[in-house]
Amino acid sequence: NKSLKERATIIQRRLIADDRGWFLKAITGTEEGIPTHTGEVYLTMGKFGQAKGGHYHPEAVEWFTIIEGSAILKLEDMETHERLDIEMSLVKAITVFIPNNVAHVVVNNGDKDFILLAYTDKLYDPKDTITYEIKG
């Protein structure tokens, strides 16, 4: 039998940071022992007064949950251009499902940084992330 030290795995992750905040993938979908069909679990932080996102995915769907701070999730359907703003915070304790072809941006509307926990059903593909600015 293998020891716990041999069976447990510590995986170094890459923290990506810029003026708006930071981004960290917790599960990339390529880990040993992960099911063959998976997506990605990630955390992202948005600094006070900043927005994160501003894109849509033709293929992937996502689920967003704020785990610290508060934000407005702005959505726009790329086919109908219907728009929806959703207030999110730890106090509200909601998870929002974002269908494919729906543009999304998360705008910090609080007095401190927000942290968002997200899941996407696909592995990251830059061809499936189309920049789009939701106006207003």
Language-model region placement:
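Non-catalytic, conserved peripheral segments adjacent to functional cores
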Residues: 1-95, 111-136
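Asparagine-centered strand-capping/turn motif at beta-strand->loop junctions
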Residues: 106-109
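Conserved SET/PR-domain catalytic core that frames the SAM/AdoMet-binding pocket
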Residues: 93-103
